[in-house]
C-alpha cells in the first residue's frame, strides 16, 4: 500500500493524493458474481428527486458480496483481492473446496492464498466468520449481523471494526467505533479482524471532476437559491438565511434528532460519543 502525492503540474493535480494497492487484481472481476446496477439519478418511481447530489458517474457492475458467511465446515482459500467501486473496502474472491466462488470483504492483512473458514468450529483467525457466542471477549471483529441469518450490517466500511466487550445470556455487548455500546444476539455472526483498506481516508480527489466520475453532483447553499427552492433562499444581497439552518424540506439540520425507532432503544446500552 503506497500513498502518492501528485506533483502540481496543473490545478487539477495540485492537491491529489492517491492510495495505490499493488496487491489488487488488475484484470476483470469474476463474471459469475456480477449484477446489473442501474442509475437512478436520485429519483424515485415518480421521477422526483428524493436524494440530492446524485447523477452521472461511470457505469458500474454490482459485485454480489457474501455477507452471511453460512458455508460452514467447508475450507476455502483467498484467490485474489479486488477493487470494488460500490464500497470503500476492497473485496476478496474466495474459492471453496466444493468449487464455489464467493466475494467477501477483505480484512486487514488478508492476502491471496490465505485459508479461511466459517462456522462454530472455525479457528480464531483473521478472516474467519463465527457466531458471537464463539468469539473471545475483547476480540476485534467486523461485518457483524444485527439479526441472526440476515447478513452483516455493522462495520463494513474501510478500516472499521467493532470490539466484543461482554457476553450475558443471549446477548453480546459490542463497542462501536462511534463509542456506542450495543447489544446483539449471540447467534449473530461476525468476521474476525478489521476491514482492510484503512488508508482510504487519506486520499484526496483534488478536483470537482473526480467527484463527478463517482456520480456526485455539486452541493448548492440554500442562501444562494431563490425562495421557491429553499427556506433560506431570496433576499436582497447577501443574507444569513434569517433563521436557524434547515434542509430544503424545512427540517432543522444542526443537532435535531430524527431517530424514531423506539422499538430497538432497549438494545443500545450507551449512546455514541458526542463530538
Curated annotation (Swiss-Prot):
List, alphabetically, the Gene3D superfamilies matched: 2.30.30.30, Nucleic acid-binding proteins, Ribosomal protein L2, domain 3
Which keywords, in A-to-Z order, does the entry hold? Ribonucleoprotein, Ribosomal protein, RNA-binding, rRNA-binding
**Mind telling me which SUPFAM superfamilies this protein's record contains?**
Nucleic acid-binding proteins, Translation proteins SH3-like domain
The UniProt entry, under NCBIfam families, shows:
rplB_bact (TIGR01171)
Pfam families per the record?
Ribosomal_L2, Ribosomal_L2_C
Q: Which gene encodes it?
A: rplB
Originating species: Shewanella sediminis (strain HAW-EB3)
Q: Which GO terms describe its molecular function?
A: rRNA binding; structural constituent of ribosome; transferase activity
**Region called Disordered, residue ranges:** 223-275
Cross-referenced InterPro entries, in alphabetical order? NA-bd_OB-fold (IPR012340), Rib_uL2_dom2 (IPR014722), Ribosomal_uL2 (IPR002171), Ribosomal_uL2_bac/org-type (IPR005880), Ribosomal_uL2_C (IPR022669), Ribosomal_uL2_CS (IPR022671), Ribosomal_uL2_dom3 (IPR014726), Ribosomal_uL2_RNA-bd_dom (IPR022666)
Family of the protein in this entry: Belongs to the universal ribosomal protein uL2 family.
This protein's name? Large ribosomal subunit protein uL2
How does this polypeptide assemble, per the annotation?
A: Part of the 50S ribosomal subunit. Forms a bridge to the 30S subunit in the 70S ribosome.
Name the PROSITE patterns on file. RIBOSOMAL_L2
Superkingdom, natural source: Bacteria
**GO biological process: any one?**
cytoplasmic translation
What function is annotated for this protein? One of the primary rRNA binding proteins. Required for association of the 30S and 50S subunits to form the 70S ribosome, for tRNA binding and peptide bond formation. It has been suggested to have peptidyltransferase activity; this is somewhat controversial. Makes several contacts with the 16S rRNA in the 70S ribosome.
Ranges in a coiled coil: none
Question: What are the GO cellular component annotations?
Answer: large ribosomal subunit
